[in-house]
Amino acid sequence: ATSNVFSMFDQSQIQEFKEAFTMIDANRDGFIDQEDLKDTYASLGRGIKDERIRDMLAESSGPVNFQIFLGLFGDKLSGTDPEETILEAFKILDADNKGVINKNYLAEIMMTQADRFSQSEVNQMFDISPIDVAGNLDYKSLCYIITHGQEEE
């Protein structure tokens, strides 16, 4: 990842990545390390195994500073379709890899983290979302609806 990584994104995207990087870099040393990732998952109410964190960090060629962070996202996002990108974002919140996320948990995350959606915006999303009787949102179906405009037949 060289300085041309910045040409992959527009200024607003770079700013959003910078905000995300700053949130994850808990100790504010300019690098994302194992402890930063553990703290981030803990703040989201999720545990994560050390092995999984090591796997994530192994994707970079060295210490993860902002430029490397941006490059990792550039690599992940280049050649992916919007549906896959949205799906990957939901998968981060699905620690058990069941394909569903509790709607109350999702609402809390959406209204308290990063872009902070309003209750009205979250309700609009839930209005078009497949949610089961236990209150779990089927995010794979929601991704399809978001990118194609209707549920799969």
UniProtKB/Swiss-Prot annotation:
Ca(2+) binds at residues 25, 27, 29, 36. GO terms for cellular component: myosin complex. Keywords: Calcium, Metal-binding, Motor protein, Muscle protein, Myosin, Repeat. InterPro entries: EF-hand-dom_pair (IPR011992), EF_Hand_1_Ca_BS (IPR018247), EF_hand_dom (IPR002048), Myosin_RLC (IPR050403). Residues 12-47, 81-116, 117-152 form the EF-hand domain. GO terms for molecular function: calcium ion binding. Pfam families: EF-hand_7. PROSITE patterns: EF_HAND_1, EF_HAND_2. In molluscan muscle, calcium regulation is associated with myosin rather than with actin. Muscle myosin contains two types of light chains: the catalytic light chain, essential for ATPase activity, and the regulatory light chain, a calcium-binding protein responsible for Ca(2+) dependent binding and Ca(2+) dependent Mg-ATPase activity. This chain binds calcium. This is Myosin regulatory light chain, smooth muscle. It comes from Halocynthia roretzi (Sea squirt).
